[in-house]
């Protein structure tokens, strides 16, 4: 659907970390380095996160490791997968479970505001006021954290839900 395609294009732009119009290994490197630097990860922890992020990019974004992917290719890949394969939802669930498991560096199964800001910054989204708005849309609890499952489910809905009448927290965040 046009609505879903519009959201996939937003997702593509969010992955184009260096904002050059193409997703390539440079985007992977920049996101991994920013993420480990922001979290001040060193040694084995840094290496582990970088390996896990590389695996995520290769499995769910490039499909062919080390390749470049245009917005058109990205949208076509998702569209083809969505149309032919009822396992699309399961694939996207695995996709977001994997990346948010990496992002949840302290493994407490929740995301606090700083983790959220760092994750967005690692993907080239430096506008902190927009990121704070996005976090607020997820309705943090009294400890100012959001369950990891809530964040993952919001992203899954963003890339799989065709119903434009439903509130889409991630789409709203990117458009704010």
UniProtKB/Swiss-Prot annotation:
Protein origin, superkingdom: Eukaryota
Binding site for Ca(2+): 104, 106, 108, 110, 115
Protein keywords: Acetylation, Calcium, Metal-binding, Muscle protein, Repeat
Positions with a binding annotation for Ca(2+) 1: 16, 18, 20, 27
Keyword DNA-binding included in the entry's annotation: no
InterPro entries: EF-hand-dom_pair (IPR011992), EF_Hand_1_Ca_BS (IPR018247), EF_hand_dom (IPR002048)
GO molecular function: calcium ion binding
Record bears the keyword Repeat: yes
Ranges of residues in domain EF-hand: 3-38, 55-90, 91-126, 127-160
Its biological purpose: Like parvalbumins, SCPs seem to be more abundant in fast contracting muscles, but no functional relationship can be established from this distribution.
Protein name, entry field: Sarcoplasmic calcium-binding protein
Source organism per UniProt: Mizuhopecten yessoensis (Japanese scallop)
């Amino acid at each position: 659907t046009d609505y879903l395609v519009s959201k996939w294009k937003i997702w593509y732009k969010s992955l184009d970390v260096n904002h050059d119009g193409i997703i390539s290994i440079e985007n992977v490197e920049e996101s991994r380095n920013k993420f480990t630097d922001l979290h001040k990860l060193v040694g084995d922890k840094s290496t582990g996160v970088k390996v896990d992020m590389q695996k995520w990019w290769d499995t769910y974004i490039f499909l062919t490791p080390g390749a470049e992917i245009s917005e058109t290719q990205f949208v076509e890949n998702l569209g083809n997968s969505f149309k032919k394969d009822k396992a699309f939802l399961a694939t996207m669930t695995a996709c977001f479970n994997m990346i948010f498991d990496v992002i949840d560096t302290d493994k407490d199964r929740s995301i606090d505001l700083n983790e959220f800001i760092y994750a967005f910054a690692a993907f080239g989204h430096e506008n902190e006021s927009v990121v704070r708005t996005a976090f607020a849309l997820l309705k943090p609890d009294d400890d100012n954290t959001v369950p990891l499952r809530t964040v993952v489910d919001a992203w899954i809905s963003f890339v799989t839900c065709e119903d434009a009448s439903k509130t889409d927290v991630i789409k709203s965040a990117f458009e704010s």
